[in-house]
Structure formats: C-alpha cells, structure tokens
Amino acid sequence: MTNEIRNELQLMTNALRDKIQIEKVILFGSQAYGNPKEDSDIDLCIITEENKRKIELIREIRRIIKPYKTHSMDILVYNLKEFSEKSNNFAGIEKTINEKGVLIYG
C-alpha cells in the first residue's frame, strides 16, 4: 500500500468515525496483498454496529467518504455479528478478508 493510499484511507476512516459507529475498517484485495496494478481499485470492508438497513448504511458511507476519495473503491459492509459468523464458518471472501486483510482501524 502506498503512502497516498494510506493517507486517503486515514482521512476516510476519521470522517467515518465522526459520523457512524464503526468497529473495524479492513483493506483487502490487491492493494492489501501487495500486488496492485496502476489502475487497481481500493477494496474496503467496513464492520459496524449500526442498526440501519445495509443499503442505507452504504449510501451514508459513500456520502461521508466522497470528499476524500481519489481512487475507485469497492466497499463491503457488515455488522459485527454477521462478519464474525461468515469469516469463521465459510471459505468465502469474509474468511480471506479476516485472514489476509490489512486492519486500518479497530
């Protein structure tokens, strides 16, 4: 992860912490695993304790980070219980995020 990406993620995380109740922010994908290409996007997993519908939460997160976002970004959002269950019980993306992702906050 470059310093530019690290700074962008820090600004976004700080903005999110001021507005919503986040437990963790995890970077995953090529930026986290050390093999990004020039046009690679940023893959983020945001784990929260908010009791809002997921679609509403994603919209709110996108609105909050928009002023700081300079790269293309994919965002996955989970509540803490959901992420814990999926990362422990399945061989899916949640397990990979939990094992290989880079913890940005939490």
Where are these regions (language model features)?
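Catalytic core of pol beta-like nucleotidyltransferases
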Residues: 1-24, 33-38, 49-106
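Glycine-rich beta-strand-to-loop/alpha-helix junction loops that act as flexible
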Residues: 28-30
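Short, conserved active-site loops that position catalytic residues or coordinate cofactors/metal ions
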Residues: 40-42
